[in-house]
């Protein structure tokens, strides 16, 4: 699958950009009001008691700030942040080494925590609950178990697939927050802040236009800001206005709803090839030349979220809004 400009997954070009734009403290963090307010209380209480913060789980779509919040927790607690990812921890010994190198109060951030294998995950249970790990040394009849004490630490887990977490792991997190998509106003505030950091001049209407097309996701908003900046510099006077933003985003094929050519291809295919549905995900995928898993996990969620596609017992159906957005005539059909 080719990389899309509007993918919310982390791209190589995002890493340096996100690092430079990432807020360091809760007061600078925009959006996620409920999670932010609760974390402020939990962190302050833990600091007053001189304890480590309870283990924290963030879940929700990619690009909404899970990694950023892990860093903020460490900064607010005044401790070190250690970062890893589920797929990178292949053996229990790898996890044991990471845990054994933590210092008192450290924050251990595990991205994609749902991808930990079972043996590694089971090593985490006593570590999270009792701050100990049991290591088996030797093999066969000579094998023996050694218990190692760990410093008190905070595990921050992040996942886009909360349903794939096992109950024993999920239940060991004392703080659980779902991160929500951002409003246009919140994204506008993020874009304005990022533009200042990047030393790019942007007016209110330009920031609003960018925010509207950013699919509720800060990562995408910052990526689009960076690309629109290039057009403003080369094609205009360097200032991002509504006109500049529209010009650049139209060239990048990101429309007013944040859809790209593949999103629109799915909608048009369903309308023209399948009379708007109901149609199965496999048929859609075959027609556009993608695998069904990619269509279901990557493309479909945003279309459903924005009311362009409905999931029904008989299959997927496009809505009247989808017809209007694609500029195609709508024939009313009763859904079943």
UniProtKB/Swiss-Prot annotation:
Pfam family name, one: AAA_lid_4
Query: Catalysed reaction per UniProt?
Result: ATP + H2O = ADP + phosphate + H(+)
Q: Which GO terms fall under molecular function for this chain's record?
A: ATP binding; ATP hydrolysis activity; four-way junction DNA binding; four-way junction helicase activity
List ligand-binding residues for ATP: 21-22, 63, 66-68, 129-131, 172, 182, 219
Provide the species name. Answer: Lachnoclostridium phytofermentans (strain ATCC 700394 / DSM 18823 / ISDg) (Clostridium phytofermentans)
Query: Which Gene Ontology cellular component terms are annotated?
Result: cytoplasm; Holliday junction resolvase complex
The organism's lineage?
Bacteria, Bacillati, Bacillota, Clostridia, Lachnospirales
Where in or outside the cell? Cytoplasm
TM ranges are: none
Report residues binding DNA: 311, 316
**Name of the protein:** Holliday junction branch migration complex subunit RuvB
Q: Which SUPFAM superfamilies match?
A: P-loop containing nucleoside triphosphate hydrolases, Winged helix' DNA-binding domain
Q: What is known of its domains?
A: Has 3 domains, the large (RuvB-L) and small ATPase (RuvB-S) domains and the C-terminal head (RuvB-H) domain. The head domain binds DNA, while the ATPase domains jointly bind ATP, ADP or are empty depending on the state of the subunit in the translocation cycle. During a single DNA translocation step the structure of each domain remains the same, but their relative positions change.
Q: Which InterPro entries match?
A: AAA+_ATPase, AAA_lid_4, DNA_helicase_Holl-junc_RuvB, P-loop_NTPase, RuvB-like_N, RuvB_C, WH-like_DNA-bd_sf, WH_DNA-bd_sf
Keywords attached to this Swiss-Prot or TrEMBL record, sorted alphabetically, are: ATP-binding, Cytoplasm, DNA damage, DNA recombination, DNA repair, DNA-binding, Hydrolase, Nucleotide-binding
Q: What does the record give as the function of this protein?
A: The RuvA-RuvB-RuvC complex processes Holliday junction (HJ) DNA during genetic recombination and DNA repair, while the RuvA-RuvB complex plays an important role in the rescue of blocked DNA replication forks via replication fork reversal (RFR). RuvA specifically binds to HJ cruciform DNA, conferring on it an open structure. The RuvB hexamer acts as an ATP-dependent pump, pulling dsDNA into and through the RuvAB complex. RuvB forms 2 homohexamers on either side of HJ DNA bound by 1 or 2 RuvA tetramers; 4 subunits per hexamer contact DNA at a time.
Q: What is its EC number?
A: 3.6.4.-
Q: What class of enzyme is it?
A: hydrolase
Q: Where is this region: Large ATPase domain (RuvB-L)?
A: 1-182
